[in-house]
Amino acid sequence: EDSGLTELDPRRTAVIMGTALAGVETIAESQYGLDTLGPDGAARKMQLQAWSNMAASQIAIRWNLHGPLLTLSTACASAHDAIGTAARMIEAGMVDVAFAGASDRGRTKLQILTMAKYGMFIQQPDRYKACLPFDINRTGVMPGEGAGVLILERADRAKARGATIHGRIRGYGSMA
């Protein structure tokens, strides 16, 4: 709504989403159901909720889009890479508009246990200093769940339609 876009060219609009864990929680729930109740315990919804491309697919279905549809999985950098990839597609003239972001739901007992075994969690007892994602003094990760999507377009296109521009992407880099 905030974008002010009322019309989209379905073939010139991309959807690029990122995820680190996709539907790992749904898979874990289904496996538990199968293990405890047998075949009837496996959730039918797993086929729709566990696939990593479902967030991007649901956006495309909702807006009747037929342009590029990508799901990237680059761990904690998935949202960053989705937004960067979308910006590059716009800059290259491949698309006019892109929905770009990420979503994750995946705090299973197994995930928490294995992350703890690797010593990945924050070792900061002061809750006001605990979450420092871009700070050189950070001591680990803080798991969470959430989603966010930006709508990107060229600046000249946004200005021409009188859009409120909230920011500009000046560059993007990704490395192994």
Predicted ranges, named:
Residues D126-A176:
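Condensing-enzyme catalytic core mediating Claisen C-C bond formation in acyl metabolism
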Residues R12, A22-T85, M94, K117-M142:
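Conserved catalytic cysteine-centered active-site region
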Residues P10-M17, L70-T74, V95-S103, T164-Y172:
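Beta-strand segments within the central parallel beta-sheet cores of soluble alpha/beta enzyme folds
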Residues T19-L21, S103-R107, D156, G171-A176:
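Glycine-rich beta-alpha junction loops
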Residues E1-T13:
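Conserved active-site "lid/cap" helical segment
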Residues E1-D2, A55, A82, E153-A155:
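Short, well-ordered amphipathic alpha-helical segments that serve as non-catalytic structural scaffolds
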Residues S103-R105, I112-M120:
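Fold-level recognition of mixed alpha/beta catalytic cores in primary-metabolism enzymes, strongest
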Residues Q58-R62, T85-M89, L150-E153, R157, ...:
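Alpha-helical scaffold segments in soluble metabolic enzymes
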